[in-house]
């Protein structure tokens, strides 16, 4: 038995990626040898001829899929061979199948299954009748069937024989691999997903109101809309129907699919006695078997495509959050807001060490506002606090006001307040690692510590939490657990290794994400560090228990040792390339002269240092790294300057131009914090004069942006914003650009939005960026005329975020 070789897998991947087969082959060999994607992308550029991390991740996914396909192909060949039905033609078809779906189509007639009506009919000797009627439509069906009536075989009469023959033909039609493949693609290209509200669910399912009478082609449905409708169905609000094509004017006329089935088997109405029966059989096969089977396939394809896109968005948002600008080594006061239980307070010094904790009760029911301000001021003064990090959960607005009053009352402290996502903080607080890291602290206070540290270094703190708990995705609880975890783990791995890790200060969870390490080795590194003191060289890592040559090769370049024996250990230059640097240093007059000297480095000819092991890409990377060794690729920390006097929703006026922070990006737009405790929405159509397909092309979480207020709805706490600062409130086209066909009911399409879940679902599924609200700003602008349009409500309705009770 033969199957396509690994080489054919590599050639297919190369074709899909648009690269050379030898590049794929080299990458596959490295992956199979235990190398990680970050290591290959950074340190094996010559081998892969410059494949980057994104290409390698795609390659890794395709390799997994194609290997699973080959395993399944082998199993199918073995199964069919055991049945004694493996002809040369069938083998060729199985070996030529390029997708799992095509392979299963071919295998369907041979797949072990429970006894069907068709099998029972065959056992009763009715297959010759079926073959005869299909081969000779001139025969009158009922008359021909009379000869096959046999009560002893369970065939009571001629009609029963005819029913058995129909079952045999229907199964045959529905198991024709080529026919099924053709109909599947036709259905995908022509079909649409329709939704109707279930009777009596109008009020209870109001958040899905955009889908109460809705239909859209499969190929045009964005992921968030598919997931919204599937959730509406799951919650018992919507009935979904897969329509193979647009409804016909004459419902009794055969569909194009029935015509295709009939044509495939030479069935046509030529006035012969058997034609009508055969056409009815083709229709019956389509409606009772093929359409059901393809409906399951298409639904699965819709869900898979929607999940893939949602996972992509989740991963992209997570990447932005992890790579957000770190505030750095600045003493920070963390506030974990709460009402009855109080605001938990934690002060961490410049290194992240907890130096003080407390609980204050500024809000209801105790209302100890002034006393809370005094306590916070004393803590800030005693520990030279520079930043105040406020969690964005319950009571965050009120606690943000407390911080604003603290800044106003004590300008000498020179504090800056920043709203920080607290998503996942409670998960961390109750985790085993938190109890090991902060054993002396009550669980309730650990969240405040995490909030403060997130501002100092988002990446180092967020890696302690399961990525799914960070919550920056759409419909994340509706997604495949395996698919989501695999994608998010890859993002965390890429981010951690892209930034690099200080081996002498990193936590075990952070070390565990470094290439080649894992949780077990991470614990061993920390234990070795605790027992023997800080590492003074990368070579000393080899003394760590169970850290062998392969692990050392994979991790060494990503681990930094600052102030150690060798200055190169603080850079991303891999130890295996140190001889190259020594040669450079010899030419320049020493390593110390070389490092950080842009002029000296630029005077060197990279080509002169290329050898049989290290090519030009690696040498060029080394020169770039030596210019700024250990550089942090993350952006510089800055916060938005909110306008003074604009602190609550009622302070906003249409026409104001404000600075704000992007807190979350969804498929339909971006949410922006402008300092009034309620995020505004920039719809995707208000981001640019040009068409924007993906809002992330324009902004990402954490970006500082200038926005214009287009409309304010205080009753519903809705703010409509635009990035197009020349838009005018009340002018058609301002803030929201209409596109043909949007917003139609009964087969129309809402604008790019979420549907089910509403704003609350978005907020739960979208964490704020680490840096958000700052408390100081400039003067207040002139009042603008009241809005004359309803652009904001329109955008929110189309996004599925409107409260229907207030329509």
Question: What do these predicted regions represent?
Answer:
Residues 14, 18, 325-329, 493-527, ...:
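C-terminal accessory/binding modules appended to enzymatic or scaffolding proteins
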Residues 24, 61, 357-364, 387, ...:
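Short beta-alpha connecting loops at secondary-structure transitions
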Residues 36-37, 52-117, 121-147, 151-152, ...:
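Accessory alpha-helical DNA-binding modules that contact the DNA backbone or grooves
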Residues 298-305, 310-315, 469-500, 608-654:
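Long, charged amphipathic helices and adjacent flexible linkers at domain junctions
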Residues 561-807:
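Single-stranded RNA-binding regions, centering on S1/OB-family and related RNA-binding modules
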Residues 52-58, 65-334, 338-429, 433-441, ...:
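Duplex nucleic acid-engaging cores and interfaces of nucleic-acid transaction enzymes
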Residues 89, 102, 106, 418-419, ...:
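Long, charge-rich intrinsically disordered scaffolds of nucleic-acid metabolism proteins
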């Amino acid at each position: 038995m033969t199957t396509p070789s690994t080489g054919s897998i590599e050639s297919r991947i190369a074709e899909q990626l648009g690269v050379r087969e030898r590049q794929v082959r080299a990458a596959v060999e490295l992956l199979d040898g235990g190398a990680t994607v970050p290591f290959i992308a950074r340190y094996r550029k010559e081998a892969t001829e410059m494949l980057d991390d994104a290409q390698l991740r795609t390659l890794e996914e395709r390799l997994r899929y194609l290997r699973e396909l080959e395993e399944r192909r082998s199993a199918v060949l073995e199964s069919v061979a055991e049945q004694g039905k493996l002809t040369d033609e069938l083998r060729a078809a199985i070996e030529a199948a390029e997708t799992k779906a095509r392979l299963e189509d071919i295998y369907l007639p041979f797949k072990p299954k429970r006894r069907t009506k068709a099998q029972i009919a065959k056992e009763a000797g009715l297959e010759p009748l079926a073959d005869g009627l299909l081969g000779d439509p001139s025969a009158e069906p009922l008359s021909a069937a009379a000869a096959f009536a046999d009560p002893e075989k369970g065939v009571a009469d001629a009609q029963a024989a005819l029913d058995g023959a129909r079952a045999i033909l229907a199964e045959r039609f529905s198991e024709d691999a080529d026919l099924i493949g053709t109909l599947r693609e036709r259905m995908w290209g022509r079909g649409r997903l329709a939704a109707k509200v279930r009777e009596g669910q109008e009020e209870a399912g109001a958040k899905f109101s955009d889908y109460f009478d809705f239909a859209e082609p499969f190929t045009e449905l964005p992921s968030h809309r598919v997931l919204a409708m599937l959730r509406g169905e799951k919650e018992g609000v919507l009935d979904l129907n897969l329509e193979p094509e647009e409804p016909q004017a004459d419902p009794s006329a055969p569909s194009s699919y029935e015509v295709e089935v009939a044509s495939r088997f030479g069935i046509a109405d030529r006035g012969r006695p058997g034609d009508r029966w055969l056409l009815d059989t083709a229709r019956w096969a389509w409606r009772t078997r093929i359409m059901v089977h393809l409906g399951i396939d298409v639904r699965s394809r819709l869900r898979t495509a929607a999940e893939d896109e949602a996972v992509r968005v989740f991963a992209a948002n997570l990447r932005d959050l992890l790579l957000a600008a770190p505030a750095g080594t600045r003493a920070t006061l963390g506030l974990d807001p709460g009402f009855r239980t109080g605001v938990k307070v934690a002060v961490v010094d410049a290194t992240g060490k907890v130096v003080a904790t407390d609980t204050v009760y500024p809000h209801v029911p105790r209302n100890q506002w002034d006393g809370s301000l005094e306590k916070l001021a004393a803590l800030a003064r005693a520990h030279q606090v520079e930043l105040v990090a406020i969690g964005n959960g319950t009571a965050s607005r009120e606690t943000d006001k407390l911080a604003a009053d603290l800044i106003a009352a004590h300008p000498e402290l020179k504090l800056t307040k920043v709203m920080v996502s607290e998503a996942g903080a409670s998960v961390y607080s109750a985790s085993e690692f938190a109890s090991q890291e902060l054993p002396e602290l009550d669980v309730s206070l650990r969240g405040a510590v995490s909030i403060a540290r997130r501002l100092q270094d988002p990446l180092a703190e967020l890696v302690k939490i399961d990525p799914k708990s960070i919550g920056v995705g759409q419909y994340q609880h509706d997604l495949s657990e395996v698919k989501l975890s695999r994608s998010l783990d890859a993002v965390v791995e890429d981010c951690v290794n892209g930034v690099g890790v200080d081996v002498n200060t990193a936590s075990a969870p952070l070390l565990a994400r470094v290439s080649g390490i894992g949780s077990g080795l991470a614990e061993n590194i920390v234990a070795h560090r605790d027992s023997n003191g800080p590492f003074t060289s990368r070579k000393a890592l080899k003394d760590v228990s169970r850290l062998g040559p392969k692990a050392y090769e994979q991790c060494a370049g990503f681990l930094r040792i600052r102030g150690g024996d060798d200055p190169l250990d603080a850079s991303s230059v891999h130890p295996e390339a140190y001889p190259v640097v020594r040669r450079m240093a010899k030419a320049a007059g020493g390593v110390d002269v070389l490092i950080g000297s842009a002029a000296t480095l630029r005077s060197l000819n990279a080509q002169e240092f290329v050898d049989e092991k290290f090519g030009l890409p690696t040498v060029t990377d080394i020169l770039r790294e030596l210019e700024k060794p250990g550089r942090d690729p993350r952006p510089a920390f800055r916060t938005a300057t909110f306008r003074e006097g604009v602190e609550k929703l009622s302070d906003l006026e249409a026409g104001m131009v404000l600075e704000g922070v992007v807190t979350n990006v969804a498929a339909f737009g971006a949410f922006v914090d402008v300092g009034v405790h309620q995020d505004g929405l920039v719809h995707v159509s208000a981001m640019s004069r040009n068409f924007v397909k993906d809002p992330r092309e324009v902004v990402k979480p954490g970006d500082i942006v200038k926005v214009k207020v287009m409309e304010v709805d205080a009753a519903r706490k809705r703010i409509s914003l635009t990035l197009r600062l020349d838009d005018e409130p009340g002018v058609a086209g301002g803030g929201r650009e209409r596109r043909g066909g949007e917003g139609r009911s009964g087969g129309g399409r809402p604008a790019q939005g979420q549907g089910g879940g509403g704003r609350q679902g978005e907020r739960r599924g979208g964490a704020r960026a680490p840096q958000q609200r700052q408390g100081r700003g400039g003067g207040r602008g002139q009042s603008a005329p009241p809005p004359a349009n309803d652009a904001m409500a329109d955008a929110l309705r189309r996004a599925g975020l409107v409260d229907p009770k207030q329509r």
